[in-house]
Structures are given as structure tokens and as C-alpha cells.
Amino acid sequence: MKNNYNLRSIAAIAIGQVLDQGQSLSTVLPSLQKTISDKDRALLQELCFGTLRVLPQLEWCIQQLMAKPMTGKQRTLHYLLMVGLYQLLYTRIPAHAVLAETVEGAVALKRPQLKGLINGVLRQFQRQQEELLQRAANNDSRYLHPSWLLKRIQQAYPAQWEQIIDANNQKPPMWLRVNRLHHTREDYLQLMEQAGIAAEPHAEYRDAVRLLAPCAVTDLPGFADGWVTVQDASAQGCVDLLDPQDGEQILDLCAAPGGKTTHILEAAPKAHVMAVDIDEQRLKRVKENLQRLRLHAEVKQGDGRTPQQWCGDKQFDRILLDAPCSATGVIRRHPDIKWLRRDSDIAELAALQAEIIEAIWPHLKSGGVMVYATCSILPAENAEQVSAFLQRHADARLVETGNQQQPGRQNLPHPEDGDGFFYAKLIKM
């Protein structure tokens, strides 16, 4: 039975909501996915994520193929063209099906008069594909990053920037966190082997396992029973560094969606954990994750800049501050970040981070441990932030966690390893 919707037009609408309205794909996609069949959901995700991952290349090709861009009310048709080009370049969908479905997208978008234009541009691309790709390989569109971000990465990592860009442009590996309350990692790896799922342990992070090929969570042994959680390896490093202990008062600040909250409780099930986030909606995810794993934490809505409003004068033995950041370390998981962020955001985020760390420091007990973490790779949010904090606070001591000259440890995204992530471990004197 033929569907009564056109998937390519839905993808074009989603891309428009990201690029024109500044919404994230994780906000846009769930409601759109409710309108389509289960089997089409993965394809919609692939079309949206893939198109945004290689956006500059697609944009450049369209500029060569059209005398003037489609603007105003026709802008969604421009995104439809991008979706068409993405399929021709990066998917195994037969070209005739790509053309037929993408051209029909113009009808679904109530622009049937533009069917001929869409068809013509896609066919012209097929004829000129080899020549266009050769030319595209010699201009800046090949980096698939906005120029401001490319410049920042080049300045921060003069010897490594190309590897970082390359990692950002690839699909991410799927990492799991084995729940040590149920199984050792070795035991769970055996269960996966019996289920025919190929995986390997992380060399450093004790609960982390990488799947050699992604699979549905429903295929993972004991997922519904909380035996395992999907979480990137670098994100797991936060709790390894925090080293929570039973009986301690622990704060997970900026906790949503709860991956680190639950990891703390798996590591120290008798700890008293408070999970706080400013976003009431995202706190629902924290509660869902706690429920699936049958763990308990005190979950509160609150602003990290005003902790007295949600914890009074309470002090904690350990604090994990996973600060709001540019998310430049997780671009491969969320390619829309490249187009949602602006250069001016970085200074604003650094100011917000400084405000939060200042506000929460008095709530750490003397002798207590704070881990400051971000999923950014930009020094302004990471090593520079920690250096400035240490200069302001004689009562803070940095625990060395890396071999760099800068304070803290900076993980960079790697095709076979974790995302870009920064951690610094501070002890209150």
C-alpha cells in the first residue's frame, strides 16, 4: 500500500526548521516521525542528519547548477533539492527512485509547478557529477564546516585539525555502558557474542563497550531490564574521574538527560544523588532513565547560577558539573550543531560557565571533589575556563588528569573512540 505522505518533503521541512528557525533536529524529528511508518523513520533520520552533515557540499553544487537560488516561500524546495542530491551521492537508493520521490516532493509541498525544475536540476547533476565533485574537492566546502568554526579548530589544534574535521564528518560509533550492578563488562561481552553482536571493550573506561556495527537497542541483551545504556565512551569518563562513593552526598548539575546521573548510581548505589537541570522538559528524560534502571535520585528543576534557590546552604562531597557548552565535540552525533551555533555564542557560553562554577563552588565541602566537564573542544570553554577559575580561587587544587601542558584533559573525537570531551578534576582545600 502506498504511503499518503512524501518522505523527502518531510525531510526538507525538518531541514528548514533547523536552518531557518534555529531548532535542533532532536526537537524537530520526534513530532514528524509520529506521522510516518516505523520502517520510514530510520530513512527520515538518515536524510536529515546526512544532508546537514554535508550541507556545504550540497549548497555549492546547487549554486553551480542554478542561476539563482530559491528564496522566500520556495526555500523549502531548495532543501528538497539538497535532500535529492544527498541521496544520489551518499545512499544506495536507485537513482530513478530518488528522482521520482524527490520530484513528487514538490507536489507534497504544494509547488507542483516546480516539478520540472527539480527534475531538471537533479538530472543535470547526474550528467555533471564527476566534474562537479572534482571542483568541490578543491574549495573550502570540502571541509563541511562553517568558516568561523573551521578557523577556531585550526587555531586550537594546528597539528590535528584535519583529523578532527574528518572525525566530525563521519557517522559516530555506537558505545554502550554496561551496568555493573547487573554484570561485569566481560560477562556482558559474552552475552553479546552469544546474541551475534560484535563488540569490544574500551581500553581505559571500565564500563564502555563499542559495537562494531550499530544495532537496535531492542536487540541488546537485557536492555529493557537495565543491563546496559547507550552512552558515548568519553561521556562515561566523567563518572570514572568523579569516583563516587557509597554514602556520599553527590550533585549532578546540568544533569539532563540523566546518563551521568545513572552512571553515578551504578558506581555508588548507596550514594545520595541530587540531579538538577534548568529544563523541566528534559528532566522527564532523567526520570525515565532512572525508572528503566530502577535507580533513585532526587530530581530538581533549577538554575545552576542560583543554587540557594534549590538546595539552600547544603554542601556536597562531590559535584559533577557538565556545563552548558557549544557541543563542538559531538558534531558527528548532532551535525545540526554546525549550523545552529554562531561564533559569538562561544564568549556568551564561557561567561555562563564561569557564572555557574562560581555559584556552585561554595556548595562543595572542604576536601570535596568537583569534576568540570563539557562536550566541547574549544579552549575558551575548557582549559582557559579552568585556568581562570584557579587564578580566582586559592582554595582550589587541580588534580592532573592528562599529559598536556594545559589544565584538565581534552579528548578529541576519533572514529574508533569517544566524542570530543573535556574534564578537569578540582579538589577544595
From Swiss-Prot:
UniProt superkingdom? Bacteria
Does the entry feature the keyword Methyltransferase, yes or no? Answer: yes
EC supergroup of this enzyme: transferase
> Is this entry keyworded S-adenosyl-L-methionine?
yes
Q: Name one GO cellular component term.
A: cytosol
Cross-referenced InterPro entries? MeTrfase_RsmB-F_NOP2_cat, MeTrfase_RsmB-F_NOP2_dom, NusB-like_sf, NusB_RsmB_TIM44, RCMT, rRNA_ssu_MeTfrase_B, rRNA_ssu_MeTfrase_B_ent, RsmB-like_ferredoxin
Q: Which residues form the active site?
A: C375
Q: Which UniProt keywords apply?
A: Cytoplasm, Methyltransferase, RNA-binding, rRNA processing, S-adenosyl-L-methionine, Transferase
Q: Which HAMAP family match?
A: 16SrRNA_methyltr_B
Provide the protein name. Answer: Ribosomal RNA small subunit methyltransferase B
Q: Which organism is it from?
A: Serratia proteamaculans (strain 568)
Lineage of this protein's species? Answer: Bacteria, Pseudomonadati, Pseudomonadota, Gammaproteobacteria, Enterobacterales
